[in-house]
Curated annotation (Swiss-Prot):
Residues 354-374 are annotated as: Disordered. One of its GO terms (cellular component) is early endosome. Specific subunit of the TRAPP II complex, a highly conserved vesicle tethering complex that functions in the late Golgi as a guanine nucleotide exchanger (GEF) for the Golgi YPT1 GTPase. TRS120 plays a role in the YPT GEF activity of TRAPP II in concert with the two other TRAPP II-specific subunits TRS65 and TRS130. The gene is TRS120. It is found in: Golgi apparatus, cis-Golgi network. The modification Phosphoserine is found at residues 379, 387. This is Trafficking protein particle complex II-specific subunit 120. Its main location: Golgi. It holds the Pfam family TRAPPC9-Trs120. Keywords: Golgi apparatus, Phosphoprotein, Transport. Part of the multisubunit TRAPP (transport protein particle) II complex composed of BET3, BET5, TRS20, TRS23, TRS31, TRS33, TRS65, TRS120 and TRS130. Interacts directly with TRS65.
Length: 1289
């Protein structure tokens, strides 16, 4: 029997207590299954039981009856109820059944049971052996109380139970005979102070109102359907009860005066009444319900006369049980008159056609009809039973007996129960004849369970009776609209139990009371009331010093409390603005403390550990210092010792993890290499053949090789920690202790996955541990980290650590960076309460290390150079590694000009300036610094030397130095990637200026020179060209005037070249300037169409913004640009020092020659003019009066065709006096001409003009032309610089 699941049945006194014990070799599961099989036949029909030789208990006396067996596996303590056996004999355990699964001797087993349980009157054995021996079978056949079944308890169980029932009836007959000649005393008279008297906490108002609910109210409540009707009924109950009670008192006084003349007669009547009451109890056990009803009626009649209230109440209880059992059997009966007197009954009115009505169904559909006949309310036909015997007729006429079909039976039972309590209350005034508190309480309990069973239905049906008799109880899914007993009435009735001093009762009795009330509250849906009662039950269990025989299902009690409190699901978050929530959390805390104490008392360390963890985890903020200390020392530590707690309860202990490299003093040894795929390097080299610099940005050597795995990813905030095998690293973790007691950390380890590659130094942990973490503090623990093995490309995450706390096994704890604030919008279960941290770690193999030993000629990597010179250096480096070779090496120079430029420098520059700048940058990146004889492999600990050539011929004046970036590394073992490192060597270069070109000019050449000056280099060059080419004239040349300044401290010799012209060597003293003239042919505009040639781009792919220049401005920019490029690309100058001719250099004219202006472009590039003009004379020298022809050829250029809308322009011939440079008038006496000096010319084709001239005065004359849009010289579009000179002698 599970005392924690006690739910007494109202008809419990009719059930035979039967103890079932195991004999042999049973397991708990097998024995429980066997008892369960036996329990399936707990109801035995008397008609199936063999008759016995007893007129009182023979089954033949009432074949409709049944025997109810209540199977127990735990026996009652006889000492607790010994004094109650004379008053309520049904409390005794009568039958014992030994289940035997071996081949032991039956007689031995019977003797064992009689010795161990001597008070049990009917011992029986049931053999469940598989194959009993023949001798055993013969023994079983010869013994009446030994039976044989199968191992699965399926064979002959019903027959066996019928035989056990017969044995019980036989034993009961003998047992009852001992009562016949015994004076029956009340429990208080037998036990004295050992029997606890019922004690009420406050004055019981029960006797004045609710104890005698009249039957008029019982019957009228059937038809009540409104609240107003209920109030009226209540008033009727009170007034009817008062009138009935007064009449009963007067009637009883008259009868007592005539019947009780002496005290001896009174004693005899009391003894007789008690004997009849005991007989009724035994007849209930024997299934003789009609006889029991008669016995109880006789007992009530007698006891009522002598005012034996205790036994009278018990007899009334027996009558109500008889009513229910007869209704359960479906038999009709009548309510005795004595019941009508004590609990006045009014008949219900039905239609006259009612015949053969079942008492069950008659009470299932009550009606408010007041007609003289009733409508049948069932279809069950029950044989009519004989009325109770005539002893009841002595007080009243038979006409006062009421058929059960005419009353509301549930309310009658409730009315009788109230009357029983009324008599029990009256008995409390006696010093020995009082109701023991256990009797009082158990009667309240079974009445409460009866009302609860009726509450679950709106009609008194067969199902309700089954629930009452078979003690079936389960929670309702749907509450009926009109239950027989409203829920509030059942609840108020349960409060009567709190009017008693329950704590003085035996602990077993308290457990029964509290467990029953808890189940009632569960069925009624009062969860908090259920929780309250279960807490009282726990307190009662905890307070008793006695050893309690705990049922294996005791955990259900604790689990129910935890479930009602919603502890497992709820989070203990306190809201200071909600006092009710705080109170509820405090209640949860106290219940948990209680559960821990109870679990500890019964040595259930698993539950102690479970609830201790919940309490310390979720309710820390509600526990003070002493509570936390006691919880830790008394429960948590012992649970850890006995291994009930195997893991630390706080998952948020680990707050931060940091891993740092311990750096060396040499910064180059601390460098982490980049990891790059071999394929990416090969494709990069192919791309560099066509493009060495990213066109979008200035040159950046570290964008040439992108690492494949170790790349800073802006999308993730977790950086990758990269280490090298053999690195010294330091591991630091921060742990928190939010509790008010100290704890120790015994071990810290990394996760298994990463421990293969790196691990915390175990020796350091053993040496410095354990680590004590003070209460309510955070401690940092720092330990060495050993880097063992490379992970290569794979990246591992450290999101947790394995920590051993309080000597518990290693346990994983996530890294908690911070707590996340609650989001009122986001309430999903997936919303995490914490911000978890993690470290990404990658371990590369051991790497080579390159160091610079020396650079020749330099002191501290600094050097002074003359502008325009070149020099060589020898650089010596060494591989410091003793095990790793360098099999990839690349040197990338980077000067300060490239470093200073912004990435978007090109966006606001015009195309011509951009070309000049990027051409210079391109030269700087390709030609300024060159590496010679670079090795491909450097072995471990090998020293090598390579050459570096520094060219300063074209560097700008703001060049101050460069960095030599040595990119080196080693291939992976599988050659899938290369690990790259860099060594940056800075060099400072100081430039000293040598030859500068401060100014430059361009002038036309219009006449030839005499032979006397042909020794000049440039004149000699022009004259030789004219002689060699007949169509070449002096006007086809221009003169480039260059000023060279020597800014150095020594003299310099230099020469200039332009195409095939080479000047003489000029000596320029220090701080002096010399002009050198360079003859240059004019640019043939027919061959070089500059206006249609765009300015080139060094780095194609630029997305230029519109410059804002119109077409003419663009053409003008192109012409200026290409004229400058034409000159600079062919102009060269070499020099050497006069003091040391081994020091040579060159001049980069890009640094000195600015953009050309319009005059320079007009002079060097005729395509800029509207017309190409040629002036030709037959002879350059004539005599006075000699006729000469002047031929002028004009050819319109593309400029003319693009800009001119008209088809004709006008050409004016202009004559100058070469000596005075004055223009001669059109009409003069020095030169005569035939025709007009103004001639029309075409804008689309070549025009040829001939003019005959007769000089009449000696002199030197220049002929030139002026082209205008009209014949009056307005709108001049070109005044040609071309002229021809005529000498007249």
């Amino acid at each position: 029997m599970n005392i924690l699941k006690h739910f007494p049945s109202y008809v419990g006194p009719s059930k035979i207590r039967t103890l079932v014990i195991p004999i042999g070799h049973w397991t708990r599961k097998e024995f429980n299954n066997a008892v369960q099989k036996l329990s399936e036949f707990n109801e035995i029909h008397l008609s199936d039981v063999t008759p016995i030789d007893s007129p009182i208990f023979t089954p033949q006396g009432f074949p409709h009856g049944k025997l109810f067996f209540d199977f127990l596996t735990i026996d009652h303590d006889d000492a607790l109820e010994l004094f109650l056996y004379d008053f309520e004999p049904f409390r005794k355990t009568f039958v014992i059944i030994g289940l035997v699964n071996d081949y032991s001797d039956p007689l031995t087993n019977l003797n064992f049971m009689k010795e161990k349980y001597p008070t049990l009157i009917s011992p029986n054995l049931v053999y469940a052996s598989s194959t009993p021996t023949k001798e055993l079978e013969q023994t079983i056949d010869t013994m009446e109380n030994v039976f044989a079944s199968s191992p699965d308890m399926q064979k002959n169980i019903e027959t066996i139970m019928c035989d056990i029932a017969r044995n019980f009836l036989t034993a009961l007959n003998s047992y009852y005979s001992s009562y016949k000649h015994v004076t029956l005393r009340s429990p208080g008279a037998i036990g004295g102070n050992a029997v606890l008297k019922t004690t009420l906490i406050r004055q019981n108002s029960y006797t004045s109102s609710s104890s005698s609910t009249p039957m008029s109210a019982v019957q009228s409540s059937v038809s009540s359907s409104s609240k107003a009707g209920s109030v009226t009924t209540a008033s009727k109950r009170l007034s009817s009860f008062e009138m009935t009670t007064n009449s009963l008192k007067r009637s009883a006084s008259l009868k007592l005066a005539t019947t009780l003349s002496t005290s001896e007669n009174r004693s005899q009547q009391k003894s007789l009444g008690r004997q009849m009451k005991i007989l009724g109890n035994f007849q209930l056990l024997a299934g003789r319900y009609v006889d029991a009803l008669n016995s109880f009626v006789d007992a009530i009649t007698t006891l009522y006369k002598v005012r034996d209230y205790l036994w009278l109440g018990s007899a009334l209880d027996g009558i109500s049980i008889c009513f229910l059992l007869l209704s359960y059997l479906g038999l009709s009966y009548q309510i005795p008159q004595i019941v009508s007197l004590i609990c006045p009954v009014e008949k219900l009115n039905f239609e006259s056609s009612s015949t053969g009505i079942s008492p069950v169904d008659s009470n299932s559909k009550a009606t408010a009809s007041t007609t003289a006949s009733s409508t049948p309310r069932n279809s069950i036909s029950i044989a009519a039973m004989q009325s109770p015997r005539n002893s009841i007729m002595s007080l009243s006429a038979p006409a006062l007996n009421i058929d059960v079909e005419n009353i509301n039976l549930p309310l009658l039972i409730k009315c009788i129960s109230d009357k029983v309590l009324y008599y029990y209350d009256l008995s409390l005034m006696h010093n020995s004849e009082y109701a023991p508190q256990v009797v009082y309480c158990e009667f309240l309990l079974k009445t409460l369970t009866f009302m609860t069973s009726c509450y679950k239905s709106s009609e008194f049906s067969k199902d309700v009776l089954d629930n009452i008799v078979k003690n079936q109880h389960r929670a309702l899914s749907d509450i009926p609209n009109s239950p027989m007993f409203p829920r509030f009435e059942v609840y108020f009735y349960s409060n009567k139990l709190f009017e008693l001093q329950l704590k003085e009762m035996q602990v077993e009795a308290q457990i029964k009371i509290y467990s029953t009330m808890a189940e009632v509250y569960r069925l009624l849906g009062y969860k908090r009331k259920q929780l309250f009662v279960l807490r009282l039950l726990m307190v009662a269990l905890l307070a008793t010093p006695n050893k309690i025989a705990w049922h294996p299902d005791y955990r259900t009690l604790i689990d129910t409390i935890i479930e009602l409190l919603n502890i497992n699901e709820s989070e203990a978050k306190i809201n200071v603005d909600d006092p009710s929530q705080s109170t509820w959390l405090i209640l949860q805390k106290k219940i948990l403390q209680l559960c821990i104490k109870v679990s500890r008392k019964i040595n259930d360390f698993e539950y102690v550990a479970k609830f201790s963890s919940i309490l310390i985890t979720k309710y820390t903020h509600l526990l003070n210092q002493s509570e936390q200390d006691a919880l830790f020392k008394e429960y948590i530590q012992p649970s850890i010792t006995n291994e009930s707690i195997t893991s630390y309860w706080d998952p948020f202990i680990l707050r931060e993890v940091v891993i740092n490299r311990i750096l060396d003093s040499d910064p180059t040894s601390n460098e982490i290499p980049l990891e790059s795929d071999v394929s990416s390097l090969e494709s990069l080299e192919n791309r560099q053949k066509t493009q060495d610099i990213n066109p979008q940005e200035v040159f950046n050597p570290f964008k040439r090789v992108q690492p494949t795995s170790f790349v800073s990813n802006n999308s993730t905030k977790v950086p990758i920690l990269v280490f090298l095998v053999g690195d010294k690293a330091e591991f630091t973790c921060r742990v928190q202790n939010p509790f008010k007691f100290d704890f120790t950390i015994n071990d810290i380890q990394l996760d298994e996955e990463i421990s293969e590659f790196c691990e915390i130094d175990r020796k350091a942990v053993s040496y410095s541990g354990p680590y004590n973490v003070k209460a309510e503090s955070i401690r940092s623990i720092t330990l060495p980290l050993i880097i063992k093995k490379p992970t290569y490309k794979k990246i591992y995450e450290i999101s947790c650590l394995k920590i051993s706390i309080l000597k518990l096994p290693l346990q994983k704890f996530d890294i908690i960076n911070d707590s996340r604030r609650s989001n009122p919008v986001e309430e999903e279960a997936e919303y995490s309460k914490c911000i978890y941290g993690k470290l990404k770690i990658k371990i590369l193999p051991e790497q080579p290390q390159l160091e610079l030993l020396s650079t020749s000629k330099m002191t501290r990597n600094s050097w002074m150079m003359l502008d325009g010179t070149k020099t060589d250096f020898h650089i010596t480096v060494r591989n410091k590694s003793l095990s790793c070779a360098i099999n990839h090496i690349k040197i990338i120079p980077m000067n300060n000009i490239e470093q200073m430029l912004k990435p978007d420098y090109w966006k606001k520059m015009p195309p011509d300036d951009l070309y000049i700048m990027e051409k210079q940058l391109d030269w700087l990146s390709k030609s300024c610094v060159r590496i010679i004889k670079l090795p491909t492999v450097i072995k471990p600990n090998e020293t090598i030397t390579f050459d570096l050539e520094l060219d300063n011929t074209a560097v700008p004046f703001n060049f101050t130095g460069f960095d030599l970036l040595i990119e080196y590394g080693m291939s992976a073992t599988d050659e899938s990637c290369i690990y790259l490192k860099k060594l940056s060597i800075p060099y400072e270069v100081t430039l000293r200026r040598t030859i500068e070109v401060p100014s430059m000019d361009i002038i036309p050449l219009n006449e030839l020179f005499s032979s006397q000056v042909e020794n000049v280099d440039w004149i000699e060059y022009v004259m030789s060209k004219i002689r060699a080419e007949s169509n070449l004239h002096s006007r086809d040349f221009i003169l480039l005037l260059l000023d060279f300044r020597n800014s150095w401290i020594d003299g310099i010799k230099l020469n200039v070249q332009f195409e095939d012209f080479t000047s003489n060597e000029y000596h320029v003293e220090a701080s002096h300037t010399s002009r050198i003239i360079v003859p240059i042919k004019k640019i043939d505009y027919k061959k070089y169409n500059f206006e249609n040639t765009p300015i080139p781009r060094i780095y194609p792919g630029r997305q230029f913004i519109q410059s804002g220049l119109n077409e003419e401005q663009t053409i003008e920019m192109r012409q200026k640009f290409w004229c400058r490029e034409h000159i600079i690309s062919k102009l060269k100058c070499n020099w050497k020092l006069t003091t040391d001719q081994s020091v040579t250099g060159s001049v980069d004219f890009n640094k000195f020659i600015e953009k050309f202006d319009h005059k320079m472009v007009y002079t060097i590039y005729p395509g800029r003019l509207f017309y190409g003009v040629q002036l030709l004379l037959d002879e350059p020298k004539v005599k006075v009066g000699e006729i000469i022809n002047l031929k002028i050829i004009t050819e319109p250029t593309s400029t003319c065709r693009r800009k001119q809308n008209s088809t004709v322009n006008f050409l004016d011939i202009v004559i100058f006096d070469s000596k005075t440079s004055k223009i001669l008038p059109r009409s003069n006496r020095r030169i005569l001409y035939n025709g007009s000096l103004t001639k029309p010319i075409s804008t689309t084709k070549v025009s040829e003009i001939n003019l005959e001239i007769i000089p009449i005065e000696k002199g030197r004359y220049e002929f030139s032309v002026c082209i205008s849009k009209s014949n009056n010289q307005d709108g001049i579009i070109q005044f040609d610089s071309e002229n021809v000179i005529l000498s007249v002698i």
